[in-house]
Amino acid sequence: MKNKDQYVYEWDTDNFKKFKSGSLRSTDADGERFDLISPFGLVRLAKVYAEGAKKYGDRNWELGQPTDEILNHAERHLNLWKQGDRSEDHLAKVAWGMFAIMHFEKTKPKQ
C-alpha cells in the first residue's frame, strides 16, 4: 500500500484535501485511521459478535449491560488466556467487552 500523502497536492483551508488529479476530499476522517486497524483482530472480533448473535439474538447486547458485569467477563477471559487456555478465543472476547463498554459510554452513559 502506498503512502496516502504522496497523492496529496495541497491542503485546502476549507477542510479539504486537493489531490494531484484535481479531486477534492474532506479531511473530517483524518483523525480516525480505520486503515490501521488489524484485519486479523477485526475478523476475530466479528466472530465473537456472530457467536453472540447466534446465542442471544443479533442486537441483544445493545440493550445494555452493567460495566462491572462486562469487566468481570473480560477479566475472566484474560485470566484464562494468561493461564494458557486456548479452548476459545479469549482475547477476542476481552476485546468485545472493551468495545461494548466504549459503545455504552456513548449510548448509555449512566450505566
What is each of the regions a protein language model found here?
Residues M1-Q111:
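Intrinsically disordered, low-complexity regulatory regions
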